Structures are given as structure tokens and as C-alpha cells.
């Protein structure tokens, strides 16, 4: 007849309710060798501890799941909130509304006389590929103008190599030549630059330029035309444009 297996009993000694101890039948204590009895006792103790830990883990897991679900819900709600743009501070009747621009062209006309890239950049706020623009490494003296309406924007003396891949200038010919608008596209905040006369998109402005202004006007080559210094007049008007027919067909309202 096989020896009886030990059992687990609760001890009430010293008020220790809930504590467990191993109780071996007398027959087992008489017949089982000491090593075997010890092994059985250790196995039963390990099983009891595992059961207790499993129960605690189940409760903890349920709590963690609830907490994680609440966190995920909060995360999704937060992510779904749109970025609240700040007021761009444009004056009433700004040229960003094409009807209020001083110089207005029909889209049909612009598609005819601008290249696809020039149209995309100036009218659709596109961006040309870095280091591929016509004026990225251009160093000739002269004046850079809006490719759409011919408004003088930058002098070659203010152009510098920013290493960004686009033409960069640290100052403008006139503070009234360019308008600034808050741009929250692509999940970031930038300041867009556009021509104040026709509303053409030029690029963006940053605060990491050289002295004396500390500004960097990062401008698309496709937004610009260039007039050599030897062909320009005193005020930059009546100049023969290089690479741009924009000024010839300009219609002022």
C-alpha cells in the first residue's frame, strides 16, 4: 500500500490565521525516507506559493489593463485635438486674399507663362528639391525679384550660403515687399514669406541668420527671377528680367 501524501493545514498557533504548514501522516513519516519527504514538502510549498502569486498577478493584471485602457483613451483624445493656430497678425485687406492684391493675374495666364514648378511653388505653396534650384549657388551681383509680378525682393549683397539647399538672404530690399504668415503645416510652426504685391509664395523665414539682422530668408529659386546689376536702374524698375516673363504681362489693379 503506497504511503499517504502529506497535506496542507492552516495553523492557528499564535493567532497566525491564514498561515499554512505541511502535515505528514504518521505512516508517511514512518515509511518515507527523509530526502523524499523533504522533496514532497518543498513541491507542495512551491505549488501553494505559485497559486498565491497567480491570484495576485491576476488582480494586478486587471488593474494594469484598466489603467492602460484609460491611458490609451486619454492619448487618443489628446492626439485627435487639432493644433490651434495663432493669429498671423496680417492687416485687414491683406494680399493673402487674392482679391486684395495690388497685382492680380488669372490662373490661366499664370499657367501659360510660368513653368510647372514655378506655378506649383508660387501658387500652391510647393517646395522645390534642395540643392537643385537655379539660384542656390548663384553669386552674380544683381537683384532678385518675384517671378510672378517682378517686385524687387533681395539684393545679391544679402545672399549667403546657409547650407540648407535653398537660396538664403539675411535682409530684404524693402520691409513692405514681403508679408509674413504663420504656417502650421506638417505639424510644426514656421513663418511663411510671400510677395506683398501678388501673394506669391516665396518660402519661410528663420531666426538663425548672420548679422546684422540674424534672419534667414529661405526662398525657393522657382519663386525668383534675377536681374544683373549692370542692367538695373536706380530704383530697380524698368529692368529687363533674366529668365522671367512675369513683369511684361503684369496687370495692376
Swiss-Prot record:
InterPro entries assigned to the protein according to its UniProt record, in alphabetical order: Met_Sox_Rdtase_MsrB, Met_Sox_Rdtase_MsrB_dom, Mss4-like_sf
Main location: endoplasmic reticulum
Signal peptide: 1-56
Positions contributing to Zn(2+) binding: 146, 149, 195, 198
UniProt-recorded Gene Ontology molecular function terms: L-methionine-(R)-S-oxide reductase activity; peptide-methionine (R)-S-oxide reductase activity; zinc ion binding
The protein's Enzyme Commission number: 1.8.4.12, 1.8.4.14
Pfam families: SelR
Catalytic reactions on record: L-methionyl-[protein] + [thioredoxin]-disulfide + H2O = L-methionyl-(R)-S-oxide-[protein] + [thioredoxin]-dithiol; [thioredoxin]-disulfide + L-methionine + H2O = L-methionine (R)-S-oxide + [thioredoxin]-dithiol
Domain MsrB: 107-229
Cofactors, names only: Zn(2+)
SUPFAM superfamilies, per database record: Mss4-like
GO cellular component: endoplasmic reticulum; mitochondrion
Enzyme class, broadest EC rank: oxidoreductase
Keyword vocabulary terms for this entry: Acetylation, Endoplasmic reticulum, Metal-binding, Oxidoreductase, Phosphoprotein, Signal, Zinc
Region of interest (Disordered), ranges: 227-253
Tissue: Widely expressed. Detected in the sensory epithelia of the organ of Corti and vestibular end organs as early as P2 up to adulthood (at protein level). In the organ of Corti, present in inner and outer hair cells and, to a lesser extent, in supporting cells (at protein level). In hair cells, distributed throughout the cell body. Barely detectable level in stereocilia. Also observed in spiral ganglion neurons, but not in the stria vascularis.
Residues that bear Phosphoserine: 244
Subunit: Monomer.
NCBIfam families per the UniProt record, alphabetical: peptide-methionine (R)-S-oxide reductase MsrB
Family listed: Belongs to the MsrB Met sulfoxide reductase family.
More info: Contains a signal peptide followed by a mitochondrial transit peptide within a single transcript. However, the protein is detected exclusively within the endoplasmic reticulum. This contasts with other species, including Homo sapiens, where the signal and transit peptides are encoded on 2 mutually exclusive exons, and where alternative splicing leads to the synthesis of either the endoplasmic reticulum resident form or the mitochondrial form.
Protein name (record): Methionine-R-sulfoxide reductase B3, mitochondrial
Species this chain originates from: Mus musculus
